[in-house]
A protein has these predicted regions:
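Surface-exposed beta-strand edges and flanking loops
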Residues: 5, 17-19, 30-34
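Short, surface-exposed, charged amphipathic helix/loop patches that serve as local interaction elements
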Residues: 24-127
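A general structural signal for short secondary-structure junctions and capping/turn motifs
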Residues: 4-6, 20-23, 67-68
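Short, intrinsically disordered N-terminal pre-domain segments
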Residues: 1-11
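Short acidic-hydrophobic surface loop/beta-edge motif
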Residues: 11-25
Length: 127
């Protein structure tokens, strides 16, 4: 079997967001990038450069900074989203980075769904 090209990290995966308690679709669809995509890796490289620079200055990473890095990685996984008839605080959220970040910081269940979807290599594997 030819294994080159088996995983395609640059393709998008449509995540149908499920209710955290019932597992039923809520009507939000998120187009996810793979955690291994170039866009996501740019964020990881930038963060790693920052961590290395801090270490050279003997500065310690705070828990808040580490959490911020994790959220920023999750934001990089979101290529777009469609909220259908759903709203967030009375509005249909746009998929710009600031809005995605704000929502993921406040909604850990949605953050988890996005991270799990982006990091599941099966979602980006050709069958």
């Amino acid at each position: 079997m030819e294994i080159s090209g088996l995983v395609s990290p640059e393709t998008l995966f449509e995540l149908d967001v499920e209710h955290p308690a019932t597992g039923k679709p809520v009507g939000i669809k998120v187009m996810l990038r793979s955690a291994g995509s170039e866009e996501a890796m740019k964020v990881v490289r930038r963060q790693t450069d920052g961590i290395l620079a801090r270490q050279q200055k003997r500065k310690v990473m705070t828990a808040e900074a580490i959490e911020e890095n994790e959220i920023d990685q999750a934001v990089s996984y979101v290529a777009s989203w469609d909220w259908g008839e759903n709203t967030y605080q009375g509005e249909t959220p746009k998929a710009d980075a600031a809005t995605v970040k704000r929502i993921l910081q406040k909604e850990p269940w949605l953050y988890s769904a996005i991270v799990n979807g982006a990091r599941d290599i099966a979602n980006f594997t050709k069958s």
